[in-house]
Amino acid sequence: MFQSLIAIDYGKARIGIASGQMITKTATPIGTVEAYDGVPNWIELDKIIKRWNPSDIIIGLPLDTQNFETDITKSAKDFAKEVQQRYQRKVHLINEAYSTREARWRLEEVKSKKVSHIKVDALAACVILETWMSEN
């Protein structure tokens, strides 16, 4: 069965978004949605969810390097609950440790001339999704 997925790299200022498919286990950055103190632009996120129509939404859970919760972990969990209620999709939380570092490394590897926050956040969502797909 074809399974479309969306991954979200939650942040207080921006939310990175990636799409993927379980059949190919590939992820593609979509872009970012602006957030204001952790509250996303729901209209933009609604459009993305409607367009991609994912069966599942994977959200990166910000934990520290020893898997302890951080200041933003509770906000990410609250966001995940709201996403589940709003879109009525399965929501999975996955440790996003090092996803931003991995995204920056990938951009440097391809010698991206402009390592913007938008690229990093969307690519971090790809890393989150690829990690989840490899584990499921």
From Swiss-Prot:
Its job: Could be a nuclease involved in processing of the 5'-end of pre-16S rRNA.
Single GO molecular function: nuclease activity
Key words, A-Z: Cytoplasm, Hydrolase, Nuclease, Ribosome biogenesis
Root EC class: hydrolase
Listed Pfam families: RuvX
Main location as per UniProt: cytoplasm
Record's protein name: Putative pre-16S rRNA nuclease
Zinc-finger in keyword set: no
Alphabetized PANTHER family for the sequence: POLYNUCLEOTIDYL TRANSFERASE, RIBONUCLEASE H-LIKE SUPERFAMILY PROTEIN
EC numbers on record: 3.1.-.-
A single GO cellular-component term on record: cytosol
Family, per entry: Belongs to the YqgF nuclease family.
Classification via CDD domains: YqgF
Protein's organism: Francisella tularensis subsp. holarctica (strain LVS)
Compartments reported by the entry: Cytoplasm
Biological process per Gene Ontology, one example term: rRNA 5'-end processing
SUPFAM superfamilies, sorted: Ribonuclease H-like
